[in-house]
Swiss-Prot record:
The keyword Calcium does not apply. The active site is at 298 (o-(5'-phospho-dna)-tyrosine intermediate). This is DNA topoisomerase 1. A zinc finger (C4-type) spans 577-603, 617-645, 658-681. It comes from the Bacteria. One of its GO terms (cellular component) is chromosome. Residues 129-557 form the Topo IA-type catalytic domain. The lineage of its organism: Bacteria, Bacillati, Bacillota, Bacilli, Bacillales. Pfam families: Topoisom_bac, Toprim, Zn_ribbon_Top1. PANTHER family: DNA TOPOISOMERASE, DNA TOPOISOMERASE, TYPE IA, CORE. The keyword Nucleus does not apply. The record marks 33, 139-140, 143, 148, 155, 300, 488 as: Interaction with DNA. Residues 163-168 are annotated as: Interaction with DNA.
Length: 689
């Protein structure tokens, strides 16, 4: 029997670590948390200083029994759960269940699961850090008090199965606020004038800039005609040439948030999938003869700090592969994470290149590892150097400007370029070599009419970025928060963008009226700051909870008394039940709308419903536009009020009217190209990506 017992969260992690520690150590998994607040009741005594009532999680009895059996036989028990607040809390709960001494130095932490890192951590065990535990307890108790007080009110007044929470309610608010911006958006007309110019055999484009040495806004066609009629022939002169050298630095290595964003954009991974695959890479991959090794550092972090050892190894790799001129000369500028001295997400060894690892990884593991590896190595490389040139092209009072850039030294861009929404700005645009006084010929002057566009709906990547920018939640909360608002049917995804549902808007309005603090961004940010202060030992967790609950309790009492019961009426489905002949109605279920017999519970007939696209019928303005299929299985769009309304369209209506003729706009797909066009006139615009 091994003298030393080591407890970690997962079997994969246990398997990897046991190989490093040898026969004197037995490593077993707790399978995550073993204790938590009960699901059947509040589990927090608000009359006894918010004392939590922890119980063994249902189904974990056999695990706990096994842990106790091994702990009883071992001389030493080490708690090696993850190196964050959640991991610290798991270690504390294990110590309580196993009745370990509070002052015992039995907590080991490592940021990467490699032989050296694990062995080093066992040389320096420490006591459980209660400040970190208390910060996690405070978050858990806060979320319990909010959820278990608001949810019953929503069940009673709106619909069973609903929930609200500190982070999820703010995320829902962001989606709804953006939708309201789109609904209230009034498009404004504007014009641009682009010129094509020729110098010798070279052609290049430039945009209208100034009239009479001042910016001149082209709001209407009349403004455009003022410029075009002022032009005299096709001869222009280069009146100014500005050349600059621009340095572009690489992006920092990944944090949890930036990894989720970039994986969504480059790999089309959802946040939950990104974290699942990252966990596999962290906990260990079987590299056959090399053994099982964790390929990346811990994946829940808000730090961009990099250890000196990792920097030195990256520098060695870059020098050998690209030459010394490609290594970074910059001093470190990474931010320190709020939770503790974590590192950024990086490969545990730069020398384990994606190509070398490919045969050991699944397709998803390889793609994510390659992304993490390239981002990290690029972060340690020299900046790119761009030569930029700006040309002023003038005729009389009219000035056009052309901007160009070429890459002088690729630096980190040899390996990796961060995805940007404005990716066109990264492309090379060569201009002919021109000097002040040179003459050029305009071969084409092209005015174009445009209309301002509403702000785009949130993609998952953009929502994660906004939550991080606002300091809402923590790295570990982004993925489950986004999952929750979808599972509750508060939002739905359309073309990879979030749209609020009717139910989501109803819940939001009730929470906004009766629990304004819960959806207040500033309140949520302040609460995160207080949780950080608990972790730092500057304030007690009970004081933070009491400061919140004393006013929140009054909000709950007011909501119970004043919130009116909202009846979400069943919509008529427009057809009769084929079982009993009663009218069918449309009901809202966990996974969206479905048809059910109005004679329930006597008749339990249900059936799937045609898919609503969330747009009102542009013909009758009463029904919803629904997706249907023709006899040849081709998708078309019709009105849910059919046959009373015979609206039909092969193209998908988008819920906005044409700014030119006020007819409805549709999304038109031709091959791989999608654009928004008017159903009536020649108006068109780019589709939201």
């Amino acid at each position: 029997m091994a003298d030393n017992l080591v407890i970690v969260e997962s079997p994969a992690k246990a398997k990897t670590i046991e190989k490093y520690l040898g026969k004197k150590y037995k490593v077993i998994a707790s399978m995550g948390h073993v204790r938590d607040l009960p699901r059947s009741q509040m589990g927090v005594d608000t009359e006894d200083n918010y004392e939590p009532k922890y119980i063994t999680i249902r189904g974990k009895g056999p695990v706990v029994k096994e842990l106790k059996k091994h702990a009883k036989k071992a001389k030493n028990v080490f708690l090696a759960s993850d190196p964050d607040r959640e991991g610290e809390a798991i270690a504390w709960h294990l110590s309580k269940i196993l009745e370990l001494e509070d002052s015992k130095e039995n907590r080991v932490v490592f940021n990467e699961i490699t032989k050296d890192a694990v062995k080093e951590s066992f040389k320096n065990p420490r006591e459980i850090e209660m400040n970190l535990v208390d910060a996690q307890q405070a978050r858990r108790i806060l979320d319990r008090l909010v959820g278990y007080n608001i949810s019953p009110v929503l069940w009673k007044k709106v619909k069973k199965g609903l929930s609200a929470g500190r982070v999820q309610s703010v995320a829902l608010r962001l989606v709804i606020d953006r939708e309201n911006e789109i609904r209230n958006f009034k498009p404004e007309e504007y014009w641009t004038i682009e010129g094509e110019f020729r110098y010798k055999k070279s052609k290049f484009n430039a945009k209208f800039l100034h009239y009479k040495n001042k910016p001149f806004k082209l709001k209407t066609k009349k403004d455009v005609e003022k410029i075009t009629t002022a032009l005299d022939g096709d001869q222009f002169e280069i009146t100014n040439v500005t050349k600059k050298e621009k340095t572009r630095n690489p992006a920092n290595p990944f944090t949890t948030s930036t990894l989720q964003q970039e994986a969504a954009r480059k790999l089309n991974f959802k946040a939950r999938k990104t974290m699942m695959v990252a966990q596999q890479l962290y906990e260990g991959i079987d590299l056959k003869k090399q053994g099982t090794i964790g390929l990346i550092t811990y994946m829940r972090t808000d730090s961009t700090r990099i250890s000196d050892t990792a920097k030195a190894e990256a520098k060695q790799y870059i020098t050998n592969k690209y030459g010394e001129s490609y290594t970074s000369k910059r001093k470190a500028s990474g931010k320190q994470g709020d939770q503790d001295a974590h590192e950024a997400i990086r490969p545990s060894s730069t020398m384990r290149t994606p190509d070398d690892m490919k045969s050991f990884l699944t397709k998803d593991q390889y793609r994510l590892y390659k992304l993490i590896w390239e981002r990290f190595v690029a972060s340690q490389m020299a900046p790119a150097i761009l030569d930029t040139v700006s040309l002023d092209i003038t005729q009389g009072d009219i000035k056009f400007r052309a901007n160009g850039q070429t890459i002088k030294f690729k630096g980190f861009m040899t390996l990796y370029v961060e995805t940007k929404d404005d990716s066109d700005s990264e492309k090379e645009n060569k201009l002919p070599k021109l000097e002040q006084g040179d003459k050029v010929t305009a071969t084409q002057i092209e005015p174009a009419q445009h209309y301002t566009q509403p702000p785009p709906r949130y993609t998952e990547a953009r929502l994660v970025k906004t939550l991080e920018e606002l300091k809402i939640g923590r790295p570990s909360t982004y993925a489950p928060t986004i999952d929750t608002i979808q599972k509750r049917n508060y939002v739905k995804l359309e073309s990879k963008r979030f749209v609020p549902t009717e139910l989501g808007e109803i819940v939001h309005e009730q929470v906004k009226e009766y629990f304004p603090e819960i959806i207040d961004v500033e309140f949520t940010v302040n609460m995160e700051t207080l949780l950080d202060k608990i972790a730092e030992g500057d304030i007690t967790w009970r004081k933070v909870i009491d400061g919140f609950f004393s006013s929140f309790k009054q909000d709950v009492e007011r909501a119970e008394e004043e919130m009116e019961k909202i009846e979400i009426k069943d919509e008529p489905a427009g057809e009769d039940c084929e079982v009993c002949g009663s009218p069918m109605v449309i009901k809202m279920g966990r996974y969206g709308k479905f048809m059910a017999c109005s004679n329930f519970p006597d008749c339990r007939n249900t059936k799937a419903i045609v898919k609503s696209i969330g747009v009102k019928c542009p013909k009758c303005n009463d029904g919803d536009v629904v997706e249907r299929k023709s006899k040849k299985n081709r998708v078309f769009y019709g009105c849910s009020k059919y046959p009373e309304c015979d609206f039909i369209s092969w193209d998908k209506p988008i819920g906005r009217d044409c700014p030119k003729c006020n007819q409805y706009l549709v999304e038109n797909k031709k091959g791989k190209t999608t654009q928004v066009i008017c159903s009536n006139c020649d108006y068109k615009e780019a589709a939201q990506k």
